[in-house]
């Protein structure tokens, strides 16, 4: 019964209908929900029954079960009120009583419903149909024949009724006919009978359908009544289980309370016994502590007495030491008087007799001292039990010995008075006295050691006894505490076991919740990961598009830049330009401020040059006599640039420059032959322009490329401020000889992603210093020939390739070590250092490789500086360039400008 009530398959349990108010609110809520569902089902069944009965009965008649419905409503109200009261009560007996009353009401309601069902049948065939278990075979012929639904609606089947219905047939008699038959009338009567019969059949069919509907409604009502009865029976059974569970719960509760009371009484008895034993143990411990305190006090008194005796002994030893010191002093006096003893030797011999007498007296005194020492020893042995009396007697003995010592000292003084007559005798007496004192001291030390040993033995014995008693008491206490701890540990283990079981249940629930949460988070994580993968793929596609666009832009800019270089290399200004006026040999400090010119310079290209131009000084001296070779006229460039560029004053035509081996275009073709990986901005590593840099101009540019080149040059020239002074400005340094590339400096082609294009505004003075290097002093500086009048001759033609070689080595070092692209700021600083430190090697006639060790140090120093962006502002005005010694040309610093060049 209890198992069925507690099983999850049962519709109602004991915990669901009756729950004490002390239970958690979850159980109350569950029980109230179950009860509400039960009553809702009852109400629905009653409503279905009421609707079925309303359809069965006519509107004039009233259903006979209105009293039963009212009784059921009152019962439901009483049940709801009782359940509400049950939520507030705490007594189980009241719940049981109310459950019994509810069961009685349910049984009466069930009995009344059965009685009314069997007592008031709706139709005569209802009882037989109930006995036949509500068979639904209403469509069968036997059922239709057995039922009599037309007794109340149709007339009875008696003879009169038949005669009324069929007057002609009833008039026919088996006897002879009264009148002759009328066939026409008979035919008409037959037709009328046919129509009447059809009408009757239709009426019978409609009545039968009505009967079938009523039978179906009756079956539904009966089924609803049976369902209601079964539900009431189930409720009665459930309430019986609840009552039985409550009775069993009350019995178990009383048994548990009785057991708990018995355990409480037993625990009180054990606690009282333990309290008594604890009080007894505390009393015994207090007594033991008092005895131990007394023993400690006696030991402390004995220690104090020993300390006093030790102090007296130390005082006596100090006095003896003083006497010994005096004896030493007397011995010294004796030694001093030995010189006079020789003369008195005879007198000493006469006094020997007196000395013998004195010896006898001293022997007697020694005997007396020995006897007195023996007496003291006996007294000390007799006084071992009482240490205080012994100490007093020992003090008395010490006082007597001190008195005797005083007597001896008086005798010594007397003998000192007679020292002149008996020095030797006195020495002997002193020796004997020292011996007696040593013996006395040794005996006294021995006595004190024996007394100390005996005292320590007694103290140790008493302490051992006290320790044994305390150990026994501690062992008994420990055993008692161990038993108590065992009992407490058993109870604690039981409580821990119950708590552990509860904790395991809670942990299992928590783990389930956490597992659900973890699954939810895993689902979210999987969704987010999928989303991240999609975003990463999209980002990768965008990055690829960006890289492709950057590469295209860099390729376009590189193509424009190559075309501009080729155009500038193939064009030359008109011949015979006016020579600039010669300045003083050493320009003053005010020259940069007076003569400022706007220089349109090429941006410095980070190209890789190898050590070239291995030529002698004589070959360079012979070359100025050669006629200059002009590549083209400036009209070609003016036609290319258009009137908008010609109107700008900052654009200056190029001066004719003599070339050693070929035209200036050849020099630029040599520039195009540099290593492609070491240019300033190289978009595609696979491109190699080859040795010819002006191939595009030789073949002819299409109009679209010419228009793009015009736009690019227009943007370059718009950044340069206009200046009308100094219309003749050198654009590029001379290139001497073909630029050969040795095979021992070839660097491996490492394809890498090019860096993005950066625009850095470099001061024009710094940019001009890259191409204008001070010329070293030469022997031809004073001449008036072309060698002294053109800046393309002399040291400039030698220093600039050397700087390019050093820059090429630096770039190759960056590439070989994998440090990436060289920043423009670091390259400018390095070139500036070369400009200031390059005066050492200007006197050399043959260009050589730079063996400076700073080439390996500068990359190491400049690599950390890449993390910090440095902006190079305009050069300070206080910085002065090195003075030129040539008289033909002013210093290049005079052509510096305060503007900037975009690179």
Curated annotation (Swiss-Prot):
Protein name: Centrobin
GO cellular component: centriole; centrosome; ciliary basal body; cytosol
Residue ranges that the Swiss-Prot or TrEMBL entry lists as coiled coil: 196-560
Tissue-wise expression: Widely expressed (at protein level). Highly expressed in testis. Also expressed in spleen, thymus, prostate, small intestine, colon and peripheral blood leukocytes.
Described function: Required for centriole duplication. Inhibition of centriole duplication leading to defects in cytokinesis.
Comp. bias (Pro residues): 572-590
Residue(s) carrying Phosphoserine: 80, 790
Major subcellular site: cytoplasm
Residue ranges, compositional bias (Low complexity): 778-791
Keywords: Cell cycle, Cell division, Coiled coil, Cytoplasm, Cytoskeleton, Phosphoprotein
Compositional bias ranges of the Basic and acidic residues kind: 675-685, 837-863
UniProt biased composition (Polar residues): 1-10
Alphabetical GO biological process terms: centriole replication; centrosome separation; mitotic cytokinetic process; regulation of cilium assembly
Subunit-level organization: Interacts with LYST.
Domain of life: Eukaryota
Region ranges (Required for centrosome localization): 365-903
Keyword flag Oxidoreductase: no
Segments of this protein annotated with the region Disordered: 1-34, 110-140, 471-493, 568-597, 669-704, 772-799, 837-903
Protein localization: Cytoplasm, Cytoskeleton, Microtubule organizing center, Centrosome, Centriole
Molecular function terms from GO: protein domain specific binding
